[in-house]
């Protein structure tokens, strides 16, 4: 069975990688779908995020990285995918994700959303936190893959925030 794990992944963190690996133990195929979130200002472009994720996940089989502009359910319907994977770090994530799952179900009745609880050691990590700490010169190497740490340093040297 194929599932999609969508997100802005700006940048991908070890928490995301943990969810991806755990989802791959459940599903035969997983599409990591890089999406635009109009409420977020991204440091990396869609294509940069896609390339970075492909580098990070290059040793995993059964995973594909794709990008999508627009409604998530349109992508799912177009590709015949009926399972959505979401990671939950806290109760506040659950409230938002439940609303999104219900809205997506209304738009695509065949869709099922599977929630994976974040591993405790990654439960506090978010892409926003990573960017903020990196911006102020903090060490984020325990929170992101090495490829991401390098890319963050390069972006910050360029003056992109």
UniProtKB/Swiss-Prot annotation:
Names of required cofactors: Mg(2+)
Top-level taxonomic group: Bacteria
Pfam family, one: CTP_transf_like
Its EC number(s): 2.7.7.3
Pathway it works in: Cofactor biosynthesis; coenzyme A biosynthesis; CoA from (R)-pantothenate: step 4/5
GO biological process: one example: coenzyme A biosynthetic process
Lineage: Bacteria, Thermotogati, Thermotogota, Thermotogae, Thermotogales
UniProt protein name: Phosphopantetheine adenylyltransferase
GO molecular function terms noted in the UniProt entry: ATP binding; pantetheine-phosphate adenylyltransferase activity
UniProt family annotation: Belongs to the bacterial CoaD family.
Native source species: Thermotoga petrophila (strain ATCC BAA-488 / DSM 13995 / JCM 10881 / RKU-1)
EC supergroup of this enzyme: transferase
């Amino acid at each position: 069975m194929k599932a999609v794990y969508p997100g802005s992944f700006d940048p991908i963190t070890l928490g995301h990688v943990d969810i991806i690996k755990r989802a791959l133990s459940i599903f035969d195929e997983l599409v990591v779908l890089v999406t635009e979130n109009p409420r977020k200002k991204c440091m990396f472009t869609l294509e940069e995020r896609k390339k970075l994720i492909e580098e990070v996940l290059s040793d995993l089989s059964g995973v594909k990285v794709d990008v999508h502009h627009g409604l998530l359910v349109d992508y799912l319907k177009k590709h015949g995918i009926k399972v959505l994977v979401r990671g939950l770090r806290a109760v506040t994530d659950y409230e938002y994700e439940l609303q999104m799952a219900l809205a997506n179900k209304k738009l695509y009745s065949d869709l099922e959303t599977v929630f994976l609880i974040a591993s405790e050691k990654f439960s506090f990590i978010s892409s926003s936190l990573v960017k903020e700490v990196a911006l102020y010169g903090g060490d984020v190497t325990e929170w992101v893959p090495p490829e991401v740490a390098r890319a963050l340093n390069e972006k910050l040297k360029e003056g992109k925030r």
